[in-house]
Amino acid sequence: LTNTLSANTMAEDVTTMLAGELEFDPPADDYIGVVNVVGTIQEQTQSSVLDTSSGYQHNTTMDYIDNLMDDSDNKGILLYVDSPGGAVYESEELHDKLIEYKETTGRPIWTYMAHYAASGGYMTSVTGDKIYANKNTVTGSIGVIMSGYNMSGLYEKLGIRYVSITSGVNKDSSKLTDEQVAIYQSQVDECYQEFVNIVADGRDMSADQVKALADGRTYTAKQAKANGLIDEIATYQDVMNQMASELGVDEFYTPSSEESILAAIFSKAEKLVPKSEAQILKETAEEKESGVLMYYAEQLQ
């Protein structure tokens, strides 16, 4: 038992060292909290000691917003979005947390869109009382996607035979039937309607007005402004200056989130390790979130 506890404790310590920690140490005076949503909005997992998480950290971001809610010195949020979207679950959870912040505190959220604020990234953005975009921002992509890979040809080539024993005709979807396609389409449609409702509420538009724009396409900043999806086109510094002036608060706070030395070492080591064809296929499938409902904008390669 002692050895098991020691091993578990050591594993937890290693995980902490790899991940690094977010320090919430806000200024002593009034401040605006900067919330960075950069990268794909999804749960972060680690499959190995070399697999260090980077980019958007969902649980850390949610905890940070909770801390801002509880701090009376916080006077608002500047939401910095540079994201093509992500999983339905995490995108909506982040949206709802930001709405909770506004309703609980009565404090404002201003949104600034950087390179990308598409799909789930746009869903996050519409929590802003004011939405600004860089002149080169790509946004929109209001819609839902569920995708997967048909690996049957590859399995046959490799001599692999898939076998499943199920309790119902729709339990196994390895070979999609028309009925199963209809089932998944109904789930996509339900999430799409929720997305439309969120945009309608956030931008004070009717559902029909949103649907006219929500066929999955992306928009430039000028197109987004013309269609009422954003308020203004500006630089990040201009938005900071305007928000500071309007709220009468000069201090902007971003929590420290430095990558640990150990994480940096493992991250570099991972890039030097040759990958097998199986690992490449696995990473490709994970990147596409196979079989998961996504508010995500595909980017041209």
Where are these regions (language model features)?
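Short amphipathic alpha-helical segments
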Residues: 92, 124, 144
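Hydrophobic/aromatic ligand-binding patch that stacks against planar heteroaromatic rings
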Residues: 123-124, 154
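Zinc-dependent metallopeptidase catalytic helix centered on the HExxH motif
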Residues: 127-146
